[in-house]
Amino acid sequence: MSSSSVVDHSPHDSAPSPLVPTASNLILIDNYDSFTWNVYQYLVLEGAKVTVFRNDQITIDELIAKNPTQLVISPGPGHPGTDSGISRDAIRHFAGKIPIFGVCMGQQCIFDVYGGDVCFAGEILHGKTSPLRHDGKGAYAGLSQDLPVTRYHSLAGTHVTLPECLEVTSWIAKEDGSKGVIMGVRHKEYTIEGVQFHPESILSAEGRGMFRNFLHMQGGTWAENERLQKAAQAQAANTKSDAPTPKKSNILQKIYAHRKAAVDAQKQIPSLRPSDLQAAYNLSIAPPQISLVDRLRNSPFDVALCAEIKRASPSKGVFALDIDAPSQARKYALAGASVISVLTEPEWFKGSIDDLRAVRQVLNGMPNRPAVLRKEFIFDEYQILEARLAGADTVLLIVKMLEYELLERLYKYSLSLGMEPLVEVQNTEEMATAIKLGAKVIGVNNRNLESFEVDLGTTGRLRSMVPSDTFLCALSGINTHQDVLDCKRDGVNGILVGEAIMRAPDATQFIRELCAGLTGPVPKSAAEPLLVKICGTRSAEAAAEAIKAGADLVGMIMVPGTKRCVDHETALSISQAVHMSKKTGSTEVSSQASKSARDFFNINAEIIRKRGPLLVGVFMNQPLEEVLEKQHLYDLDIVQLHGDEPLEWANLIPVPVVRKFKPGQVGLATRGYHAVPLLDSGAGSGTLLDLESVKKELEKDEQVTVLLAGGLEPSNVVETVKSLGPLSERVIGVDVSSGVEEGGKQSLEKIREFVKAAKSVR
């Protein structure tokens, strides 16, 4: 191009365009290039709110936490594979989530990320202006052909290695009309574009138009962008000065659009299609559920607690990325939460349906467990069915997001699956909608979803509209016990707390202070005396003597061919001796305790302790039918499985099951099956367990309690248990067989000595 045709296309009017709502948090990655300023200038002039980070001054997690609306990768020196810092990782993460635009090296990063080769372009082009041909789409929409654009590069992506997922969008035409060096690429599915030239150069024509087109792109895919653009155009066409507030606005609109695209895509995956989910539900494989309303009304606190699991939010970014959902849920449950709310939205809240599934699993077998809430942007019956199959007891329906017809349809569908939804409102209009719907549980969001401002008085002001039999929850901004007292004063029945608990160093202590106003460490319950099991019993006399000495469990061996196996008549006489000694009295627990969740092993230990003395039948690798027959025949109170029997057998046996494990064996801490795990070195081997391995086992799960067996005798039982240190509190009982024998026969004196010694431990 001759010097006479050189035109200065730089912005002569420095007044920026009106802010683009969809470009409110654009992040520009600076690859240490002077042109980055010009890119920044053009973006701001076209209405974007831009923050710049150099490519080695921010981590990917920090970048994710910024929750950008768009991502722009700047030009830069060097090769994208070695000199682009975080740029390529940023493209990988945000691809399919938000619009991405790459300039010069930025385009080369896109090319490289998807497997193309970036190499020498055939000539060094620094300041060369060339006429650009383009496809008129995306960033080039509405722009003329043969635009003069300026090039500053010696590298470029090659035609022969063009990744399958990318298409060429612009090029410098050769004299024969064929396509020359690639000047632009676009991802075929994701909202990603790149240009090799510099639209921000003063010698490039219509550069601002390219940036303007990019800033108005929305969503992570072209399909999503098209849908949102049509929706925006339709809304603009129908907008009147007196029009009501749209149902979906600002961040809600963005999240809704993203989730809609994700759900639509998921429905196409074999095994996750709507028909697949319905087939699974028809087989009744969804976990058992409980009533949301009943669980909320059965709270240990004056104001019921819905404790939330979320790692991030649109307003606060990432704040608890490393917390795992099931561990946190167990803390919530045992601290008194009535509901556990699980965020399952992956991009803005960093959750997933797998979090909910894991939370439900960790609550298995827990008496008075909390209800599980799927907190998600629900707009489709598919999401509700998916939640039920994962173990949810309830789902969230946000009135602001849903037209009444859809809201009512989703509400009724949830009820058809046995789930009373939590219906979220924010103002009087939405509250009236929820009441019209017939919602039994209504949550008032104290946070304005458009401004993110919190007003704790919102719930109280809406209380007068709520029927007396409707459960009312405050959903945001609760941080202190005084906040809870204020809610109670305003007639609020429950609170939902998320970020404050997730940030707390000790979730259990935080809940105690928040809900009950109690400070200081959680008091420990007095340690119960050790349970004592005398096993290998071969006479009614020995059984009676063991019970007289204070034994809680009397075991007899039911394994044919073993030296301690008893015959039919002896088994009957032992059974009679044990059952004639049964304790009498109430086994009720306090009404306060019944309102809190209990760990499965903890409650079973209490039940066994209250019902003793109990008769235990020991089996090893025998048919289930034989176990069931002998349990009935000898009126066994407990069945002990000492072999390789499946865990599931415990649910087929009509009495509690004690199951033998070695330290480190899989399944020991699995809830909902065996009532108590028994740690043993071997079947009557008389060999002491390796106590270090016992400690490691107990340290894995702070709620697991065990019976201890193997090599115990009157002279070492006290020392063995106490050598476990603080972990000894988790040993609820000891089991002895050969340790109370002399000459292969049970010694009544040793039985008495063992019981006395064991009971002296605590």
Curated annotation (Swiss-Prot):
Involved pathway(s): Amino-acid biosynthesis; L-tryptophan biosynthesis; L-tryptophan from chorismate: step 1/5; Amino-acid biosynthesis; L-tryptophan biosynthesis; L-tryptophan from chorismate: step 3/5; Amino-acid biosynthesis; L-tryptophan biosynthesis; L-tryptophan from chorismate: step 4/5
GO biological process: L-tryptophan biosynthetic process
Enzyme active site: 104, 198, 200
EC number: 4.1.3.27, 4.1.1.48, 5.3.1.24
Catalysed reactions, semicolon-separated: chorismate + L-glutamine = anthranilate + pyruvate + L-glutamate + H(+); N-(5-phospho-beta-D-ribosyl)anthranilate = 1-(2-carboxyphenylamino)-1-deoxy-D-ribulose 5-phosphate; 1-(2-carboxyphenylamino)-1-deoxy-D-ribulose 5-phosphate + H(+) = (1S,2R)-1-C-(indol-3-yl)glycerol 3-phosphate + CO2 + H2O
Chain residues that bind L-glutamine: 76-78, 108, 154-155
Keywords, alphabetical: Amino-acid biosynthesis, Aromatic amino acid biosynthesis, Decarboxylase, Glutamine amidotransferase, Isomerase, Lyase, Multifunctional enzyme, Tryptophan biosynthesis
Region (Indole-3-glycerol phosphate synthase): 251-515
Domain Glutamine amidotransferase type-1: 25-224
Region (N-(5'-phosphoribosyl)anthranilate isomerase): 531-762
CDD domains: GATase1_Anthranilate_Synthase (cd01743), IGPS (cd00331), PRAI (cd00405)
Any one GO molecular-function label of the UniProt entry: indole-3-glycerol-phosphate synthase activity
Function as written in the Swiss-Prot or TrEMBL entry: Trifunctional enzyme bearing the Gln amidotransferase (GATase) domain of anthranilate synthase, indole-glycerolphosphate synthase, and phosphoribosylanthranilate isomerase activities.
HAMAP family: PRAI
Assembly: Tetramer of two components I and two components II.
PANTHER family recorded: MULTIFUNCTIONAL TRYPTOPHAN BIOSYNTHESIS PROTEIN, MULTIFUNCTIONAL TRYPTOPHAN BIOSYNTHESIS PROTEIN-RELATED
NCBIfam families given in the database record: trpG_papA
Protein name as catalogued: Multifunctional tryptophan biosynthesis protein
Species, as recorded: Neurospora crassa (strain ATCC 24698 / 74-OR23-1A / CBS 708.71 / DSM 1257 / FGSC 987)
Gene: trp-1
